[in-house]
Amino acid sequence: MRWVRALLKNASLAGAPKYIEHFSKFSPSPLSMKQFLDFGSSNACEKTSFTFLRQELPVRLANIMKEINLLPDRVLGTPSVQLVQSWYVQSLLDIMEFLDKDPEDHRTLSQFTDALVTIRNRHNDVVPTMAQGVLEYKDTYGDDPVSNQNIQYFLDRFYLSRISIRMLINQHTLIFDGSTNPAHPKHIGSIDPNCSVSDVVKDAYDMAKLLCDKYYMASPDLEIQEVNATNANQPIHMVYVPSHLYHMLFELFKNAMRATVESHESSLTLPPIKIMVALGEEDLSIKMSDRGGGVPLRKIERLFSYMYSTAPTPQPGTGGTPLAGFGYGLPISRLYAKYFQGDLQLFSMEGFGTDAVIYLKALSTDSVERLPVYNKSAWRHYQTIQEAGDWCVPSTEPKNTSTYRVS
């Protein structure tokens, strides 16, 4: 019986390239925050969601799977990247099982929800596993500027695609699993229609403070100020995914606290971390200001690079959060901001401190998913060969101009 199951599995895996080729021809369909809310409103239809997801999830999976294959062979050959590929193939095949199923069958809908939970759990470790693949590549082959550029481009798109896929899965499973989250009864799936920005700020600060106190035995205080330009003197609320905002803020607080404590080791008091939340007609901006000594300008963009992490390589079985050891906190946080058309930027003054600004869309109709699509433009990016720069590179030693004198 075991060999029969193996035969069937191999037969289904053989069909994967055909599915990838087919679904990658379609572009993903980005949803706005308002559409997510409408999808999950009180009259939400599970059949409609099922019909949409069994087409949309394969499109998103297939698009990014085509890009995985464009990575350098030396990256694709690492055990970790091959493992991630196998997860994506299996998840695509899992959804294919429902392509011709009847949405009127309640058992089918229940099985689909169970399949989505299985897929979500299967992909829980995608980020650290892919990060391990990058480390395996670097340890074996060292640094290659062209490959590094392609890997950075790919990982931004790959992780953003992953965020979007988990968003779709979470919305469906949270809304249609037949239960209500007692801690957040008014949430629609993972979305809070009336998210208090300051409350999320305080939650992220409290958790970061807990870690900082545990490690350094001290932590800076928090000061929050709100400016509501659209409705003066009213607390600032928005339609957003609190877990996404928390992820961004928690990462920024950790960085700000560490910098503040380490740059004021000899001081009796620590300067506070200041938060400014401003709501305008288009943007909701959150600025975090610290007095942690700042970062040189040349290092700012490197903080968002997957290839230049200064964090120590995590060791298996040492406990803690694996992601922390890869130095991916800031790059992933910026992707969470960009996912709904926002951004995360750092402005630093070396010798003083750093301002980190999260930009989000104020209106739910403007908060539209930012999704990678596999097309000729993306393909060409991976074929680009780095050429010589067209700007002078400063020399470390002044030139002897006497050699250029006209005789």
UniProtKB/Swiss-Prot annotation:
Null allele phenotype: No visible phenotype, due to the fact that PDK2-deficient mice have increased PDK1 levels. Mice have lower blood glucose levels in the fed state, but not after fasting. Likewise, they display increased pyruvate dehydrogenase activity in liver and skeletal muscle in the fed state, but not after fasting. Fasting mice lacking both PDK2 and PDK4 show strongly decreased blood glucose levels, increased circulating ketone body levels leading to ketoacidosis with dangerously low blood pH levels, hypothermia, and ultimately death.
Question: Which tissues does the record link to its expression?
Answer: Detected in heart (at protein level).
Keyword entries, A-Z = ATP-binding, Kinase, Mitochondrion, Nucleotide-binding, Phosphoprotein, Transferase, Transit peptide
Tell me the compartments it is located in: Mitochondrion matrix
What induces or represses expression of this protein, per its UniProt record?
A: Up-regulated by glucose and palmitic acid. Up-regulated by PPARD.
Residues covered by the Histidine kinase domain = 135-364
Description of how the protein assembles with itself and partners:
Homodimer, and heterodimer with PDK1. Interacts with the pyruvate dehydrogenase complex subunit DLAT, and is part of the multimeric pyruvate dehydrogenase complex that contains multiple copies of pyruvate dehydrogenase (E1), dihydrolipoamide acetyltransferase (DLAT, E2) and lipoamide dehydrogenase (DLD, E3).
| Protein family according to the UniProt entry | Belongs to the PDK/BCKDK protein kinase family.
Residue positions where N6-succinyllysine is found in the record: 376
Gene Ontology molecular functions: ATP binding; protein homodimerization activity; pyruvate dehydrogenase (acetyl-transferring) kinase activity
Q: Provide the function of this protein.
A: Kinase that plays a key role in the regulation of glucose and fatty acid metabolism and homeostasis via phosphorylation of the pyruvate dehydrogenase subunits PDHA1 and PDHA2. This inhibits pyruvate dehydrogenase activity, and thereby regulates metabolite flux through the tricarboxylic acid cycle, down-regulates aerobic respiration and inhibits the formation of acetyl-coenzyme A from pyruvate. Inhibition of pyruvate dehydrogenase decreases glucose utilization and increases fat metabolism. Mediates cellular responses to insulin.
- The coiled-coil segments of this chain are none
| Reactions accelerated catalytically | L-seryl-[pyruvate dehydrogenase E1 alpha subunit] + ATP = O-phospho-L-seryl-[pyruvate dehydrogenase E1 alpha subunit] + ADP + H(+)
Give the organism the record lists: Mus musculus (Mouse)
A single cellular component GO annotation = pyruvate dehydrogenase complex
Q: Name one GO biological process term.
A: regulation of acetyl-CoA biosynthetic process from pyruvate
According to UniProt, the name of this protein is [Pyruvate dehydrogenase (acetyl-transferring)] kinase isozyme 2, mitochondrial
**So what EC number does this one have?**
2.7.11.2
- Write down the top EC class of this protein: transferase
